[in-house]
Amino acid sequence: MNQSSFVHLHNHTEYSMLDGAAKITPMFAEVERLQMPAVGMTDHGNMFGASEFYNTAIKAGIKPIIGVEAYIAPGSRFDTRRITWGDPSQKADDVSAGGAYTHLTMVAENAAGLRNLFKLSSLASFEGQLSKWSRMDAELIGEYAEGIIVTTGCPSGEVQTRLRLGHDREALESAAKWREIVGPDNYFLELMDHGLSIEQRVREGLLNIGRKLNIPPLATNDCHYVTRDAVHNHEALLCVQTGKTLSDPNRFKFHGDGYYLKSAAEMRQLWDDEVPGACDSTLLIAERVQSYADVWEPRNRMPVFPVPVGHDQASWLRHEVDAGLKRRFPDGPPNGYVERAAYEIDVICDKGFPAYFLIVADLVNHARSVGIRVGPGRGSAAGSLAAYALGITDIDPIPHGLLFERFLNPERTSMPDIDIDFDDRRRGEMVRYAADKWGHDRVAQVITFGTIKTKAALKDSARIHYGQPGFAMADRITKALPPAIMAKDIPLSGITDPAHERFKEAAEVRSLIETDSDVRIIYQTARGLEGLIRNAGVHACAVILSSEPLTEAIPLWKRPQDGAIITGWDYPACEAIGLLKMDFLGLRNLTIIGDAIENIKTNRGIDLDLESVPLDDQATYELLGRGDTLGVFQLDGGPMRDLLRRMQPTGFEDIVAVLALYRPGPMGMNAHNDYADRKNNRQVIKPIHPELEEPLREILAETYGLIVYQEQIMRIAQKVAGYSLARADILRKAMGKKKREVLEKEFEGFSEGMQANGFSVHAIKALWDIILPFADYAFNKSHAAGYGLISYWTAYLKANFAGEYMAGLLTSVGDDKDKAAVYLADCRKFGITVLPPDVNESVLDFASVGADIRYGLGAVRNVGANVVGSLIKTRNAKGKFADFSDYLNKIDITSCNKKVTESLIKAGAFDSLGHSRKGLFLVHADAVDSVLGTKKAEAIGQFDLFGGTDGGTDAVFTIKVPDDEWEDKHKLALEREMLGLYVSGHPLNGVAHLLAAQVDTAIPTILDGGVSNDTQVRVGGILAAVNRRVNKNGIPWASAQLDDLTGGIEVMFFPHTYSSYGADIIDDAVVLVNAKVVVRDDRIALIANQLVVPDFSNVQEDRPLAVSLLTRQCTFDKVNALKQVLARHPGTSQVHLRLISGDRITTLELDQSLRVTSSPALMGDLKALLGPGCLGD
């Protein structure tokens, strides 16, 4: 090692989040340029970057020295009090963060020391967390000191803090304590020089302690960025952290620009004369540090599955698969099943994975045993018969042509990957079960790192430079960026780099940068921020399991808000060392299915078992063929619904195909339309080559001669080239990677195989030219089949139990009012009336009531789950509410709240009590005040104290409610305010058909993605939530929500348009708008350029349509069918239903949502359903 060199040991990478600005790859490039033999990493309180740092170091050929700048509690780590050592006048010199911590620098000398650092950083989070700091203490470090080198740390260290406070004796005692804990050879006196007074004031005191205790000096540089010119990026990053601007004189900042990787010459110039040996100590430590390779050595850390005596894991797997086949096939498995299961088990055991299958099966079977709904299978695992027998999947792979080799085969070297879908609301229970089963120290969720991406970097940069006005500037810049592709924006460097593939698309934003100096400043700073880690999060589904305590292998942290244990490394780093990663996915549609089944049981008394539902239900395929699949899993979007209408599915294989085809690749080659046209005889099925027509007939028959699935490519290679399915899977992967040299090699073997089977060169080339591009987008049929089954189940529920399914669907969308509006409109189309919330009838969520749906109280603004729970408990215990007075008398103090009561009034939840909404609104505040005092007294037992112990009656209040009522228009506006949409009626009822005649695009069509960016459209509806604003130049503009009967969309009226139409942009105005569609990220909106207020003043309401029905015909199914007929003919005519029972006739006025347009088609539909006499007098 060059003795004139230097090793930087105290460095903060970007994993010191929003404090360190040193990215690891550039850091090693600079260390290499400086010809330094090693470099350290000491991030603040965590070891999140250790894996990336180590692997980057090994690639660069530079020795990694991994450590941590630890937070040390001033007392016990368990003590959450802030402890200071000086008097109040010394606050600036005292323990950091008002008494929270001091610092200590620690690095691992070897693999054992590194594992001890993992334990220390983990336990600091588990036991020493105070606010955002994970703190250790002397006791903990003493327990895990082996293999660790410690220094006195930065100026915030314990020894330096004591010296600044004038506590010289305590400083000496502190240094002696740490020296004793870690050993005299492992303790160093850390010295820094950034020209700061806090460094200079204690230097002589430190050196004196070093001389007295024989502690060698160590020079460090507290690096926070890689090179000197990155100081501005670091200043900007600190402003992102603190929310300050660069112009703020009081912002947190580092003084000077010396916190970078200085050269050896720079460091030795600082220290060699003043403190000889301080730089040499860095080389000494670097030489002492041994390889950490053992920490990253891959090893089998899969949990050992417990099996009965007399079995090993392989034999128990065979036993469980055999038992599973008997459960699946009580009359005995069909021919070939036992043989295939045996083959699969042989492969699983030969690859060493029997425990993995047993673990997954245990998880799935536990979920089912406690009523947690599990998906039927996802990914290639659905191709495994063993998985089907074990209950891991619920789709039999053999009749669907699914291949085990696509999932696992003798040639595969990596772990199989079985992902599991659970009911979204109960995923957390499964994580807890895994921890209970395998040990809480051996199971953890997985960390993710949120980085500062392109748009965020621009917005952060604009704010820190220009404050509040910067938001508008950033908006202008981000709107000029080219559209994101697959949710990824162009990197900022690509905007000005002609070599970047999207350079030409960035001309607009590049022009801004070149012509506007403010934009150029924002851009330059943003480039320094882009890509830096902003925060740590938790992966949505990944869970790590281990056979040993996880802290033996990786660092962990405890999420403060909920105590969840999280890995300190992302899942690829965990998998690389042999830890088992599983995905526990929360699937919302399983929650919807579960709610729908519960609704069916409650509403109809039917216990529905979806697994037993036949896959040939006619009503389901009729629904699919109509494209009535809003809310159906994977089939919800507008273009998908159009494809279903073209395709007219008639069997489950069509559903599987549509999921595989509706993706950019196949659609780009028009394969989706080709499939639909060939299925419906609109296109001739052509063979790939005459020689191949017969050999490939069976393989391609199900997809009408098209290659749709990866499994088909594998079967083709097996059939015509003599490949094994394992080798065919290797071919499939090679084709997907598109590497020329690999493809040439594969084509050679493929061609030889086909020639050996008698195929001509022309046939070989024709087939290769077809399967090569198809391999790039051909879909995994196993995954499509598993998800296709969920699609079928949800379609089946909607087709056969529409009310119950839609209630579950509406509950699932929660606060997404745009989705709720679309689904409510779909309910009307299906003849389902959505009833408003009701204090006497509603529960928390949407609920099916006969053929209708009742709004849940939990969907009312300002009404939380606790209030609803209290209200329902009261209703169950004391009976339904007779009137508003009875309601106030019965409810407990939880529900007795003016804001809650007002919200329920506006939402119409008291309508059934016979009061007007306005009347209740006028008296509710005084009424609540009147009863509140009594209820508070009841709650603390005062009535008992003053003579109420004999069980006397409660105090009773009577409130007189005025009869005054708001106009319908105002009632509906308030209803929308509370519910986010109109429920009991709609301001457009009676004129919607007139409005629809003047538009060219429906709002749901835009929201479904059926209209591309920048398209001009004409839409109509009613304005709501009008928000008038002023831009940075003081010019007014507005935004609003435009609602029609089917949905709502945001419309922006920018200054030019606003200046012409501002007077008409008011709440509740019915308008027609010409606008441009704007698609940005996941947000779709309209930019208006013209507005028209149509005149409907002379519209005459059509004469009511009278429909007669015998009371004995009033069955659930008949009424539901009638609603569907009426919903198919929307219009302005009221419908009167005449119920005939003998001589008695009862006339009901149907809901406004069921108004119709009288037409011969409607009359024919009614007569077909109810008989020819239904329209007579």
Swiss-Prot record:
Protein task: DNA polymerase III is a complex, multichain enzyme responsible for most of the replicative synthesis in bacteria. This DNA polymerase also exhibits 3' to 5' exonuclease activity. The alpha chain is the DNA polymerase.
Assembly, per entry: DNA polymerase III contains a core (composed of alpha, epsilon and theta chains) that associates with a tau subunit. This core dimerizes to form the PolIII' complex. PolIII' associates with the gamma complex (composed of gamma, delta, delta', psi and chi chains) and with the beta chain to form the complete DNA polymerase III complex.
Coiled coil: none
InterPro entries assigned to the protein according to its UniProt record, in alphabetical order: DNA_pol3_alpha_NTPase_dom, DNA_pol3_alpha_thumb_dom, DNA_pol3_finger, DnaE2/DnaE/PolC, DNAPol_HHH, NA-bd_OB_tRNA, PHP_dom, Pol/His_phosphatase_N
Database matches in SMART domains: POLIIIAc
Record-stated family: Belongs to the DNA polymerase type-C family. DnaE subfamily.
Top EC category: transferase
Entry keyword set: Cytoplasm, DNA replication, DNA-directed DNA polymerase, Nucleotidyltransferase, Transferase
Catalytic reaction annotation: DNA(n) + a 2'-deoxyribonucleoside 5'-triphosphate = DNA(n+1) + diphosphate
GO BP: any one term: DNA replication
Entry-linked PANTHER family: DNA POLYMERASE III SUBUNIT ALPHA
EC number per UniProt: 2.7.7.7
Protein's organism: Mycobacterium leprae (strain TN)
GO CC list: cytoplasm
Subcellular locations according to the entry: Cytoplasm
Name used for this protein in its record: DNA polymerase III subunit alpha
Sample GO molecular function, one term: DNA-directed DNA polymerase activity
